[in-house]
């Protein structure tokens, strides 16, 4: 359903704010006539997505901040940012590549999370308007957060109809590891309308990667059947989140990597989230082998988003399309190694529709 208030196919740039060292940061508004998307060069963040409910009423369904200052102050939630060089966890922050061991500073207990203490979400990316959207570019130097090789990462956001497409590419001048994803938090009720526990989740995944007590994969690919992690049919998120199941106890809810069915490298369904009340629906497709469903377990109200809303536990959910956590230390997992002359490329699409 087209929303007359939204212009079709427009991209507008404005100044979002200025960093403490004086860098002006742009924000871009993309409109399609159906939804409106805002992205910024700081961390290549997805700032907002306004989408209609079944009656055409618009709401922002992505958690975010009104100003750049909110993102500069938040070093904890990764709210809508592009995380890298290695999204998700690396055990002990250590990995070995071509016989050499590298150390990433730890920032999540004993492990490195989302690229270490200063990940890609904390840099100002170069930006360029392209047909239908924006391309952001970041050059991460050799040794950045302990990772080898100068990595050139590009993230493209393009909007067509009710679908936001995110394309990731990366090249390197030395062998390295890379795992890029977007860490948006979604709430289909609206970003100021309580928690996500009554939304329904469906995951196109028959297996998941169980984790140890520090949320590092054990290396097993376990079936979801018969567990509270079975979302092969739509399930209310909050229905089983408190079950006495060891994997849920470890994470305080859902914070696991599901193995997406189908062939990695091909665009296929990963997840469907629905809100029976508003009628809003989010369909996630990806070329990645996995998707991390995180139910906002560690949000504690210490950050205040748009509308003056404190983001408390389960305020939003993440669907981080990705290679598996700690892949550099698991040779049996799909590889995250990138060599000179190769280009890493992955695509994720987010379709914001309405239930029929």
Can you name each region flagged by the protein language model?
Residues 3-356:
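An exposed, glycine/acidic-rich loop-and-rim segment of catalytic or binding clefts
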